[in-house]
Amino acid sequence: MLIDWFTVFAQILNFVILLGLLRWFLYKPILQVMAKRQAQLAEQWQTATDLQAQAHQALEQYHQEQQSLQAQRASFLAAARAAADEERQRQLLTLREDIQAQREAWEADLHQEQRAFFHTLRQQVSQQVVAIARQALRDLANATLEQQVVARFCEQLQHLSPAQRQQINHLETPPEAVFIRTAFPLDVTHQAQIKQSLATTLELDGTPIHFVTVPELGCGIELKLAGQEIVWGLDPYLDQLEQTLAIATR
């Protein structure tokens, strides 16, 4: 049997052409559709995977937010309890301080009232003692006491400082009169004694001298001329006694 090589090659060529046609018109579109479908499936799978990951992430975030909210709630509750306790303690402390302050103020007022009462009482006693002493001296005044008062006043005139004498003797306006005020009437002898002391001490140049009785002066003598004043009596000693008693009874 003879082989027809031409036929063989023709069949092979036909087969190759058929394969090419099949591949080009049948397999390639099928492969393209399959590739496209596979790409769509892969894309859908990736989308599903992404959605699942997003869902998982959202769920995880939700759990985290829940935990954060729980922690914040616990923190807020703890802070509220702490603030309430602190406010209660502050109010209790304020109440105690107010009570203590009121108590101290009441005690201070009580002590102040006690001190004021005893201070007033001591002052009244001191003033009464001095008043009794003044009245006793007035009641006991006699000729001997009057003589001693006049003598002390004349002695004070003799011991005036040069500055005092200069001030009295060189007044801008000469005095029209000299007034001698006493708590008791002076007899002629005592008046003459005082006039003599004034004449030897001051430059009065015939200025009239008037004697005036003022019982309120107590045991003392007061000289006044042109605004100048010379005083001697027991009142300064009694005033000093009153001040000493006032200081001692504070």
Swiss-Prot record:
The keyword Cytoplasm does not apply. One of its GO terms (cellular component) is proton-transporting ATP synthase complex. It is a single-pass membrane protein. It is found in: Cellular thylakoid membrane. The keyword Magnesium does not apply. F-type ATPases have 2 components, F(1) - the catalytic core - and F(0) - the membrane proton channel. F(1) has five subunits: alpha(3), beta(3), gamma(1), delta(1), epsilon(1). F(0) has four main subunits: a(1), b(1), b'(1) and c(10-14). The alpha and beta chains form an alternating ring which encloses part of the gamma chain. F(1) is attached to F(0) by a central stalk formed by the gamma and epsilon chains, while a peripheral stalk is formed by the delta, b and b' chains. This is ATP synthase subunit b 2. It comes from Picosynechococcus sp. (strain ATCC 27264 / PCC 7002 / PR-6). The gene is atpF3.
